């Protein structure tokens, strides 16, 4: 059995079979997990044509198991991923945006320790931008860090998080965030393997 193949329920016995029979949700990342390189649904990791992902999603749906993609992607991107795959829920922006029911448009922002009042008329992202903390980080490390906008066309809009990319000392950035008093956490959402062009 390869490292990425799980046994089927029929191959299991006893307690493990009973435990797996109670699974109702599969939470999974997208890139290099559900999707092949290049965010492709119909290819395998070697680039060969494959329907394995589609077959797995269909089999899980038939078993009554809901697949919930989770990603750092913004709403527009992950919404389309979920819609095309026939999924009804997703978690975007590193946990900051939860779509409970896509068909009913039932969603909410999760902002952790960041004080946020939805009645302010701004998104959490806009509230963060208004503090000036992002500009402070960019000014502290010129040419070392920049906004990471979604897609190579420079689509910037995010609702909860601020995407940045570069090589800066994590502890110093976190200190700047702590000083701003916004309850923000500096987190890594992975390493980029390809940059098509600067997006700032």
Where are these regions (language model features)?
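Non-catalytic pre-domain segments flanking phosphatase-related domains
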Residues: 1-30, 34-35
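Acidic/polar N-terminal loop/beta-strand segments that form early-domain functional surfaces
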Residues: 29, 37, 70-73
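Short acidic/His/Gly/Ser-rich catalytic and metal-binding motifs that mark active-site loops
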Residues: 34-38, 100
């Amino acid at each position: 059995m390869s490292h990425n193949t799980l046994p089927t329920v029929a191959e299991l016995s006893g307690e493990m079979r009973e435990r797996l029979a109670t699974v109702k949700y599969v939470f999974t990342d997208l890139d290099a997990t559900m999707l092949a390189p290049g965010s492709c649904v119909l290819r395998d990791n070697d680039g060969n044509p494959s329907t394995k992902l589609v077959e797995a999603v269909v089999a899980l749906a038939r078993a009554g198991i809901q697949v919930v993609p989770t990603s750092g992607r913004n709403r527009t991107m992950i919404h389309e991923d979920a819609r095309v795959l026939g999924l009804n829920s997703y978690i975007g922006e590193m946990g900051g945006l939860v779509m409970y029911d896509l068909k009913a448009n039932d969603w909410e922002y999760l902002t952790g320790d960041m004080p946020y009042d939805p009645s302010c008329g701004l998104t959490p992202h806009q509230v963060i931008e208004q503090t000036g903390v992002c500009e402070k980080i960019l000014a502290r490390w010129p040419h070392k860090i920049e906004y990471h906008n979604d897609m190579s066309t420079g689509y910037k809009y995010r609702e909860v998080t601020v995407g940045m990319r570069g090589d800066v000392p994590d502890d110093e950035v976190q200190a700047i965030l702590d000083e701003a008093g916004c309850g923000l956490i500096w987190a890594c959402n992975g390493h980029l393997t390809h940059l098509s062009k600067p997006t700032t």
